[in-house]
Amino acid sequence: MNQLNTEKKYDVIIVGAGPAGLSFACSLIDLNLKVLVVDKSNEESISNPKPDGRETALTHNSLKILQKLGVWDLIDPTSVSPLKEAKVFDGDSDSLLNFAAKKSSIGALGYLVPNNLIRQAL
C-alpha cells in the first residue's frame, strides 16, 4: 500500500507562541523561509489572546524591535505603563539592587504591557 508523504519541510521551527517566539517568527517573514510556530495553544487563542493578568516588561531595545517589526503602533498606548523603578532581590539575602528612572536621563526604565496585547499585535 502506498502511503502519501505528508512530511513537510521547514527552514525554521519555533517552539512557543509567546511574545519572543512570535517576534522571532515576524522577523523572518521577509527572508523567504518556511517557518512553523508550534505551541500547545490552538490557533484561535494565539491569534485572539484573552487578557490573563500577565504583563511583559519591555526594555528600550525590546521596544525598538517591536517598532522595527511594525507592531508597536498596534498596541493601545493607554494600556502601556512606564516602568519607573525596579528592585532586584537575591533570595534570603539582604542584598538589594534598586534602579530608578528618575536618577537617569531617561523617562522610564522600560514599559509594562499586557502580554495578550503584545501577542495580539504580533
Q: What is the meaning of each model-derived region?
A:
Residues 4-20, 36:
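Beta1/beta-strand and adjacent pyrophosphate-binding region of the FAD-binding site
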Residues 9, 81-122:
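Conserved N-terminal helical subregion
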Residues 13, 26-54:
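Glycine-rich FAD pyrophosphate-binding loop
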Residues 16, 39, 90:
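Short beta-strand/turn micro-motifs composed of small residues
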Residues 23:
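Short alpha-helical segment within the catalytic ATP-binding CA
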Residues 26, 64, 120:
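Surface-exposed charge patches
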Residues 42-46, 68, 104:
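Beta1-alpha1 glycine-rich phosphate/pyrophosphate-binding loop at the start
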Residues 50-91:
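N-terminal FAD cofactor-binding segment of flavoenzymes
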